[in-house]
């Protein structure tokens, strides 16, 4: 048994889980998410509002998908109850972010400002011109949007300028030695 896959998934009050064949739908106070479980894995509702994820055999692929499927469904439940937040910060002279409606406008040292539109289910919050956050109920989408924003200007290893995750440590490099 997979260490992660064998753990039951607790369904909190206020969350409605519907299993229709291979499709799992989760509705909660923050919204709803749907996921299709891969073929060999089965999900069943147990007593006491618990979901159990099982696999039919001990083949390598079944073992790999067991823990993954359980974690994806658990992340859906966490998303519709608490949501996910990815905080980012900008460092560098003249680098800043502005909220333009539901979108973000970045000044990152290029000759033009960069406009990032919020995908469906994602919201941006700007705390100050150098700190902002990406919020949503889908963990994968929140992480992907945050990574795409970070990619606009990756942190420079020499001066540590750019967009980075809050708390991310940038390994600094020593510059060229002068004569």
From Swiss-Prot:
Entries under PROSITE patterns matching the protein: RIBOSOMAL_L6_1
Disulfide bonds: none
Pfam families: Ribosomal_L6
UniProt-listed SUPFAM superfamilies: Ribosomal protein L6
Entry keyword Ribonucleoprotein: yes
Functional description taken from the UniProt entry: This protein binds to the 23S rRNA, and is important in its secondary structure. It is located near the subunit interface in the base of the L7/L12 stalk, and near the tRNA binding site of the peptidyltransferase center.
Similarity comment: family membership: Belongs to the universal ribosomal protein uL6 family.
Protein name: Large ribosomal subunit protein uL6
Native organism: Streptomyces coelicolor (strain ATCC BAA-471 / A3(2) / M145)
